[in-house]
């Protein structure tokens, strides 16, 4: 289960001293909201508290987190679920925490990679890029008529840095699912499932 804490802070960019950057091999950090389990995304899907608890209790996810291997790309890839190591920009730096407001808060390192440097440049410019989860799973309609991602089938891959996050609050002040106005494509849909039109 995710640890709880009491805060309503928004995602923020943390500048590091030159010494911290060299020691960590990173360009900066993103800290703030990464998911909302009380409200549907802009895509109309709900990612429940149960889904996120199960995700971060998974032994594979824990192993990847412990080894700093939950690596995210600059933008969601259009044609695959797995992460391309040559395109990584961020890394989930520690176990996310649940706020009392239904939001999950996380910390990401901006990596000193080509895509990480692009991301840092955008952040330095003032671009408030969001973060969005990537994974795969089935959906069902809940009792309120919301399309809900099934916690028992969801397979988490990572968080990516995106232009328009599906969770509106998932915007770092210095950087989960992209929102596509033309398709109801769940970036966390199984790769072999056909896209549904809006």
What are these regions (language model features)?
Residues 195-198:
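Charge-rich (especially acidic), low-complexity segments
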């Amino acid at each position: 289960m995710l640890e709880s804490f009491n805060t309503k802070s928004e995602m923020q960019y943390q500048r590091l001293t030159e010494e911290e950057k060299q020691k960590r091999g990173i360009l900066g950090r993103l800290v703030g909201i990464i998911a909302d389990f009380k409200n549907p995304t802009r895509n109309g899907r709900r990612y429940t508290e149960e889904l996120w608890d199960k995700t971060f209790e998974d032994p594979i996810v824990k192993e990847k987190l412990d080894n700093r291997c939950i690596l995210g790309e600059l933008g969601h890839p259009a044609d695959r679920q797995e992460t391309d190591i040559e395109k990584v920009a961020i890394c989930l730096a520690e176990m996310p925490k649940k706020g009392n407001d239904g939001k999950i808060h996380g910390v990401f390192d901006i990596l000193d990679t080509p895509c990480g440097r692009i991301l840092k440049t955008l952040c330095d410019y003032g671009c408030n890029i969001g973060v969005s989860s990537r994974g795969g799973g089935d959906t069902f309609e809940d009792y309120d008529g919301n399309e809900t991602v099934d916690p028992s089938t969801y397979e988490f891959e990572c968080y990516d840095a995106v232009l328009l996050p599906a969770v509106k609050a998932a915007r770092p002040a210095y950087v989960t699912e992209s929102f596509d106005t033309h398709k109801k494509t769940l970036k966390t849909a199984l790769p072999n499932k056909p896209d549904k039109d809006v």
